[in-house]
Amino acid sequence: LKELKKIGKEYYVSGTAFHNYTNYPASYMSQLYNNHPDHEIIFTEHSEWGISGMYNIQKYFWNWSRSYMYWVTMTTYDLDEYNQGPYNTLSELSPTLLIENPDEPDKFYVTPEYYLLSHFSKFVRPGAYRISCDKGNIEEASFVAFRNCDGTIVLIGANQTNSLKNFTLEYQNKSSNSSIPPNSIGTYIWKE
C-alpha cells in the first residue's frame, strides 16, 4: 500500500483480506488500520469453534475486521469424502456449521458452530459497525459490541470459565446488571 500511495495509485486497492493459516496475531490487522485507516480489513476463510473460538472471532473485530467468514460451511458425513486435500491432516470430521445427513441428503445436522456464528449473523445486521466496549479478558468474560443501522446495540459475550460471570451493561448514563452462565456465549441487545 505504501508503494501504491507513493505513485498516487492507492485507489487500486480498497481492502485487504486476512487469513489465519499461519496463526499470526490479530493485532496485524490493527497495524494495517493504523497506517491506512481508510482501507477496509476483511477476515476470511478460517474456522473457529467452541467458546474459545468466540474469543478469537472477537479479537478479529477488535482489530478492525469488517467481517468474519467461516470456513467450511457444510461437509458430508461420509468419512471417505471429508477433509480431502493436501492441507487437511485431521483424522476426524473438520469443524463445520452443517453436516449432510447420510441417509437423507436433503437434510443436515446443525453443529454447535452454527449457533456460535449465529450470535453475529442473526443480531449484527448489514451496515452495523463495531463500537468501543470493555473487552474483558479470556480468563473471565470477553465482549465485543456493535451498533446496527436501526440504532440497536448488540453486545456479544463469551464466558470460558466454569463459573457464572456477572457484569454491568452501561450506556448513556444507564446501567443494567447481567451475567453469562459458565462455558457459554450470550448476546445482549438494547435500543438507544
Q: Would you name each region that the model predicts?
A:
Residues 1-192:
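Substrate-binding and catalytic surfaces of secreted/luminal carbohydrate-active proteins
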